[in-house]
Amino acid sequence: MNQIAKTMVVDVDDTILTTVNRDYANSKPIVEVVSKLREAKSNGWTILLHTARGMGRSNGKIELVQEEVINEIASFCSKWDVPYDEIIVGKPWAAMYVDDKALRPDEFANLDLNNWSPRL
């Protein structure tokens, strides 16, 4: 499998963690998804975390909060042992994302990575 075929892009908020009232210091992991990320990492996957966090509070100017957002997410990942290779900020803030390769978090958590094949 080539490198792209073993790369996943994963949203952060309400995908790998839950947060109440934007209290990111007290975010809680979505255990089933984090467990699947650990499994994926141990099987050689590259994990890119891509988030729209900060886009609202910066009015779409992510450079104003980029360092803060990356530090919030890196701290969470360290605290809860969430594997990742890179944190990418600046995902457009939207009500809906339409993507032919998308999975809902519960679908991902139940996915058999050994018998899954990508749509490239």
Language-model regions, residue ranges each:
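HAD-like aspartate-dependent phosphatase fold
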Residues: 1-120
